[in-house]
Amino acid sequence: MAVCIIDHDNIRGVIYVEQVHGKDKVLGSVIGLKSGTYSLIIHRYGDISRGCDSIGSPEIFIGNIFVNRYGVAYVYLDTDVNISTIIGKALSISKNDQRLACGVIGISYINEKIIHFLTINENGV
């Protein structure tokens, strides 16, 4: 399982890439964006030393997410991404080719008995 922590200005979230019932899925939630549609994109580098300006060119479009009127996006997307090929790269949340937030994709601890899914209510809790 891979995980990406997003924490940029007021935009925060956790995105996982994992197998669910034998299929690869992108799961998670993000808060702090305005209502609308945004893109999840994997970039060449995991270098966030200059924020999203140093993550390199886009490589893989994962899919679109919808942010509700409370500023919350719940992510549940199918993907054919090979998890081992994205470790160490960056994931961005973008709109109109503008990178709004990003994080580095890392290896996540796998707990076979319990998988916690981050949920956030309209109050950000």
UniProtKB/Swiss-Prot annotation:
Gene3D superfamilies to which the protein is assigned, alphabetical: Superoxide dismutase, copper/zinc binding domain
Disulfide bonds: 52-102
Role of this protein: Superoxide dismutase-like protein with no enzymatic activity.
One annotated GO molecular function: copper ion binding
Keyword tags: Disulfide bond, Host cytoplasm, Virion
Natural source organism: Monkeypox virus
Record-stated family: Belongs to the Cu-Zn superoxide dismutase family.
InterPro entries (alphabetical): SOD-like_Cu/Zn_dom_sf, SOD_Cu/Zn_/chaperone
GO biological process: superoxide metabolic process
Name listed for the protein in its UniProt record: Cu-Zn superoxide dismutase-like protein OPG175
Listed PANTHER family: SUPEROXIDE DISMUTASE CU-ZN -RELATED
Transmembrane intervals: none
GO cellular component, one term: host cell cytoplasm
